[in-house]
């Protein structure tokens, strides 16, 4: 997901019951996948395999769209992906994969062996978001659950994980059917809890790289809500940022709102801290070194005329290097405590949640160049953006680089060409982004792009010995 919500996502523990009924694909007109005007002939290797992939995919696409719609209608939150994981495990068994469930919680590992050769890991994420869907789609989610605080929330696949899962299953079907085109092992993983950046670590801690074939390469695809179907983008090197969660408990001395002089007001102190934190970015950081310090939540007080004893601040912090990360986290602690000292208040508690830290995502440059060249052959050079700017969103896919495994994540367009063109006009409304209640990717062409590119990338990395 490239953006997480600004506020810290709560760990949700209640169980969601999902209907097992299988919906038929809803008949929704889909625009044709755009074809570049000057698409050059791809090399013979690519042409032959792409034709075989497309032939297999043509016979699978209707069922993959139905799978997508089922998953979209029945989303499950982080750490609650029980039915989603079971459905994916069942789908992968049908392809002939050796499937293991409950790896690191709700994780699924499906191994497809096909003779000697390298090992390629292909990841999909499975969890949805606490968002009430407003797309108006006939297969829109109406799911609501209670979070751990007892608050009822809507649940929606608003980050494209449903597209990722359908493409993942489609890629497994294609590779299983075309074993004569490649040699080696593919490890498909269905990862839970990406939205709270916990699932990758859980699966690795559960022995993903010791109990199953260790990958020579790791691949992932992600939806892009701002570009048209049939296009994709990727970065060489830095792709996404470090992400840290910081909680600050601001302490004061409560009392009557009419007598502030006999209190130490933590609300005023918290407001000062919020403003002072912005100087970390504006006055302590090189303008060319990207840093984000966002206060996503502030809570304190119970009534108009009561000054509380404490205020809670919740921060998300984004950096791109280890040195900058360490410096920014120390600055947050220093600024919060200095503000309290100036207000004659008790020192605040500043806690960095290591459980919710995820390192920056760096695409292996050689792997990115290799896959990028292949994607240009598949889609045409003008449909591939190899200079996609890094974003300050975070992805725990970065953790699969453990043990120096080269990783590569790329982003496929998911909106119609018409919507994209309209959005380029002056004063046009912004397109619905990820983590919004209106994000509605086009299923069929998005899934096609995901399956075509991922299947060919796997084949490229798993060459058949002549």
Regions found by a protein language model. Name each.
Residues 1-9:
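Bacterial N-terminal signal peptides that target proteins for export
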Residues 8-19:
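Bacterial N-terminal signal peptides
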Residues 18-33:
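Signal peptide processing junction and immediate N-terminal pro/mature segment
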Residues 28, 35-157, 163-183:
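Acidic/His- and Gly-rich active-site-bordering loop/insert found
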Residues 41, 268-466:
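Metal-dependent amide/peptide-bond hydrolase catalytic core
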Residues 71, 110, 122, 161, ...:
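Divalent metal-coordination and catalytic microenvironments
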Residues 144-156, 162-163, 175-297, 302-308:
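Histidine/acidic-residue-rich, glycine-tolerant segments that coordinate divalent metal ions
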